[in-house]
Structure formats: C-alpha cells, structure tokens
UniProtKB/Swiss-Prot annotation:
Disruption phenotype: Leads to hypersensitivity to L-cysteine and sulfite. Abolishes the ability to grow on human hair and strongly impairs growth on human nails. Keywords: Cell membrane, Glycoprotein, Membrane, Transmembrane, Transmembrane helix, Transport. This is Sulfite efflux pump SSU1. Induction: Expression is strongly increased during growth on protein rich medium containing keratin or cystine-arginine. InterPro entries: SLAC1/Mae1/Ssu1/TehA, Sulfite_efflux_TDT, Voltage-dep_anion_channel_sf. Sulphite efflux pump required for the secretion of sulphite as a reducing agent. In the presence of sulphite, cystine in keratin is directly cleaved to cysteine and S-sulphocysteine, and thereby, reduced proteins become accessible to hydrolysis by a variety of secreted endo- and exoproteases. Excretion of sulphite mediated by an efflux pump also represents a detoxification pathway for dermatophytes during infection of the epidermal stratum corneum, hair and nails, which are rich in cysteine. Residues 1-25, 81-101, 157-167, 222-234, 299-309, 365-375 are cytoplasmic. GO terms for molecular function: sulfite transmembrane transporter activity. Its main location: membrane. It comes from Arthroderma benhamiae (strain ATCC MYA-4681 / CBS 112371). It comes from the Eukaryota. Belongs to the tellurite-resistance/dicarboxylate transporter (TDT) family. Signal peptide: none annotated.
Length: 375
C-alpha cells in the first residue's frame, strides 16, 4: 500500500493534472463560446415579450438575463486571459477559416444583453438605464460593423476555402450588424430624446443595408454549395439553421425601426409628413417577405436533421438563436398586425426555443465539467 507521502504525491499529481486541464481549456477557448450568450439572451427576450404571459414568467426572464451577464463577463475574461498569455493565438484565430467566422457571436451575444436592459431594466430604473443601453449599443454597433467589414475581406485575401468546405457559418460575421440594427431599433424606442432616436435609426438603416444584401449573396452561394456538394458534414449540420437568422432578425429590425420612424419623423419634421408611415408600412411589407423566405430555410434545416445522427458540440447553440430571432419577427408581426395567428405561432416557437435552451445548456455544462468540449 502507498505510504502517507505516496498518497500526498498522488493527490499533488491529481491537482497538477486538474490545473493543467484548466489551462488547456483556456488555451482552446474560441469566440464560438459567445453563442451561449446569444442563446441565453434570446431566450430571456422571448420569455419577457411572450404574447401570452403568466405569473412568474417575468422573473424567469430576469434570472436568465442575470445569468447571461455573468456568462458574458466570464467568457470575456477568459478570452482576454487567453490572448494576453498567448498573443499568437489571436493571429491564428483570425487566420483560421472557421474560428474567424465565429467572431460575430461576440457582438451578437452582447446585443442580447443590451436588449434585455431595455426590456427589463428601463421600465424599473427609468431614463438613465435607457441612456446607458444607448451608450452600450454604440460600442456593439462599432464592433459589429468592424467584424462585418473585416472578416469577409480576410476570407477573400487570407483564408483557404472552397465551395465544398463552405458552411452557413459564413453568415455569422455578416449577421452581426443586422442584429445590431435590430437592437438599435429597440434602444431608439426607449429614448426620450427624439434627435438621438432619429440618429440611431438612420445609422441602423445603413447597417441593415450593409449586411442584409450581403447575407442574401451568401445564401445564394450556400444554396449552390448544397445543390452541388449536398448536405454539410454531420458535425456541422446544426449550422443549417443559421440562414433563418438574418431573415428573421432582418425582418424584426425593419418592423421595429418602422415603429420608431412612425413616431419620431413627424415630431422632427423629417422628410415628408407621411415619411414615417411609409417607412413603417414598407418595413412590415419587406419583413413579411423575409419571414416567408425564412420558412423555406427552416424547412431545409429540419429536413436535414432527419438524415442521420449527429453528436453534441458547441455548435448546438445554433438550435437557439436563429430560431429565436425568427420568433421575434413572428411575435412582432402578431403585435403590429393584431394577429392571433402570429401570436400563437410565436408562442409555440418561444416554447421550442426555451426547451432547446434547457437541453443545450444542460449538455454544455455537463460536457464542460468533463472537459470534452475543450479537447
């Protein structure tokens, strides 16, 4: 039997192994982990704005919001630690054809926190919380635009890629400004200063115009890839849901910006007297078209999932956010059209997203504890 010192040596070796595993986890951390923020944040937003509320639902949304903030700052701290200890890993990440695409998850996860501040904190804390959210939004918008402009150019000049290896993850850096534009509409609606709201929504329309058409181009290329080379590998099959992200969030953003434009434009005598109504109606019209386009991509994704087994990885968080933002467009149409159909459908989608969040979050915690996700 081992002596006392032998037991001590075994315990010391085990402690060193655990510390080594922790450093390996930090070393292997990548931006895709911020998709946890995206999924958690959109679930909180859906529950907070569910068309059919019940007692206690608001507090569940608040708990998810707080959890999301904690996770965000935890991941941000890990990321800063990683790149401070291993500066070369940042350059390697930018040069990586897959990991660089995941940069877009950072501002999109941050945007869900900003939206929750508006939905949850502003009604309680008042105008200063709205101004605080507005300040955070400008940071998010700047980061989103930088990623949208920089990463696709890296794809053109530095990355080695082919049509066969393409996945829908190419959309992630491009969708970031779409999410920021939609978030800007939410923030602008809470601002009491009409001039600030006007500036915000005009910037949002420009961001929307920069990103949504480019996302449509990527969708065309992605469809060609699927038609020629068939479905993506099973490890990446969950990414089949990503195309509904820019369509759902783009539609929601246009409707939300139209709501603010309808209110703010006449007050500031901006453009013609009916300009706000035109922006509102056109936003709803285009949003319906984008929502319909999203339906067929949702069908493609669901049909793809039935083609075989696939195993858990961090990419499973794609089950939550794309469908979540598609749901926000659905519930917004129910609100603007006064439609029970869209209210019920939005509620159904919200329940599905919440159930998927519970499943994926539980698996993520379990696989993180076993270190399987960091190998």
């Amino acid at each position: 039997m081992p002596s006392g010192s032998g037991f001590h040596n075994i315990e010391e070796a085990g402690e060193k192994a655990r510390k080594r595993d922790d450093w390996i986890a930090i070393s292997n951390f990548h931006p895709g982990w911020f998709s946890v923020n995206m999924g958690t944040g959109i679930t909180a937003i859906l529950l907070q704005n569910l068309p059919y509320q019940f007692p206690g639902l608001h507090y569940i949304a608040v708990i998810l919001f707080i959890l999301n903030v904690i996770i965000f700052f935890l991941f941000l701290t890990i990321s800063i630690t990683r790149y401070c200890l291993w500066p070369d890993k940042f350059k390697a990440m930018l040069a990586h054809p897959a990991h660089s695409m995941l940069l877009g998850t950072f501002p999109m996860g941050f945007a869900t926190i900003i939206n929750c501040i508006v939905f949850i904190c502003v009604p309680v804390w008042g105008e200063w919380a709205s101004r605080f959210a507005w300040g955070l939004w400008w940071i998010d918008a700047a980061v989103s635009v930088a990623i949208c402009y920089f990463v696709p150019f890296m794809l053109m000049t530095k990355h080695t890629s082919s049509l066969e290896t393409m996945t829908a993850a190419w959309l992630l850096p491009i969708v970031a400004p779409v999410v920021a534009a939609a978030s800007g509409g939410v923030v602008a609606d809470s601002l009491q200063n009409d001039t600030h709201a006007l500036i915000t929504i005009l910037v949002c329309y420009v961001m929307w115009g920069s990103a949504v058409p480019l996302a449509m181009v990527i969708l065309v290329i992605y469809f060609q890839r699927l038609a020629i080379h068939k479905l993506v590998p099973r490890a990446a099959i969950v990414s089949a849901l990503l195309p509904i992200g820019p369509l759902g969030q783009g539609g929601f953003g246009l409707m939300q910006l139209g709501v603010v434009a309808k209110r703010v434009f006449p007050r500031l005598d901006f453009l013609a007297p009916i300009a706000g109504d035109i922006f509102y109606v056109m936003g709803a019209f285009i949003a319906m078209i984008m929502w319909g386009f999203g339906l067929i991509w949702l069908w493609f994704a669901l049909a793809s999932f039935t083609r075989g087994k696939f195993y858990f990885n961090i990419g499973w968080w794609a089950f939550t956010f794309p469908l979540g933002v598609f749901t926000t467009a659905t519930t917004q149409m129910g609100k603007e059209f006064n439609s029970p159909f869209f209210d019920i459908l939005g509620t159904f989608f919200s329940i599905v997203v919440t159930c998927m969040w519970v499943l994926v979050f539980a698996l993520t915690v379990y696989k993180s504890c076993t270190k399987e996700l960091f190998r």
